[in-house]
Amino acid sequence: MIKRSPVREDLPQTLLFELTPQHALNFFLGAIVILAIASLGVQFGLYYLPEYPSKTILSGLLFVDCESNIPTMYSVLTLILCSVILGFIANAKRAMRGAYINYWMTLSVIFLFLAIDEFASLHEKLIEPIHLKLNTSGFLYFAWVIPGAAFTFVCLLIFTRFLGHLPTQTRRLFLLAGSLYVGGTLGMEMIGGYYSSLITDRNNIIYSVIVTIEESLEMLGVAVFIYSLLHYISYYMKGTGLRINIVASKKKRRSA
């Protein structure tokens, strides 16, 4: 919500942007539902409907398994948003001389890396070399899940103490968000890998459904995580906010 602050007429007016955790969550949930329906819709049209203009173009723009399209940009931006909020919390904690500052900042860096990985599909570059090295198949057909699972386990070990110090509700939300995200990233990826190992061509509606569920779980996990961060700020960092002042350059202020 945007509203004007109650200040005197002769003073500059300030617009306050008020964001509640629930409003943010509702927005992201709506976006996820729209993206999931659009992804399945264009794939259904691709495989079952007669030819129509922009048939393959729409699939490229909206199917969640394609690169550099609308769902990818949504995921990248929400991961960057997580990184920004985590960095904001870390800096606020530093100003208040709070605890676990390095953990908050490390999480910020991790989410920035996840955003870069989402944009550039770095993890997929691990599939072929690991697959050739270990001759993986079945649930490990997409072999990057092996280092992915190891990375997840190491992060869980490192952040166990940090999770323990969080308020109970925040900790539960963090764990829920992580479970959804990992369930999509690794769990559904393994199911998709198993299915892919049984067929010769992944261009079918069944694989499209698997991938859409996978990406939707990832998006849902990120949405819940953003909600948990905003909830943490609003309940346990009361008085913390972000204000943006728009000022003239020094040169213009001197000449005024």
Which role fits each region the language model picked out?
Residues L49, E124-K133, I191-E214:
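Interfacial helix-loop-helix junctions of multi-pass membrane proteins
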Residues A115-L157:
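Membrane-proximal helix-loop-helix units in multi-pass membrane proteins
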Residues I2-R4, P71-F88, I146-L157, S216-Y232:
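Hydrophobic cores of alpha-helical transmembrane segments in multi-pass inner/ER membrane proteins
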Residues E51-S68, H131-L134:
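Perimembrane loop-to-helix junctions flanking transmembrane segments
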Residues N91-N102, R161-L173:
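Membrane-interface helix-boundary motifs at transmembrane edges
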Residues Y103-F111, T168-G193:
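Alpha-helical transmembrane segments of multi-pass integral membrane proteins
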Residues M237-A256:
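Short, highly charged, low-complexity non-transmembrane loops/tails of multi-pass membrane proteins
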Residues G30-P53:
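Alpha-helical transmembrane segments of multi-pass membrane proteins
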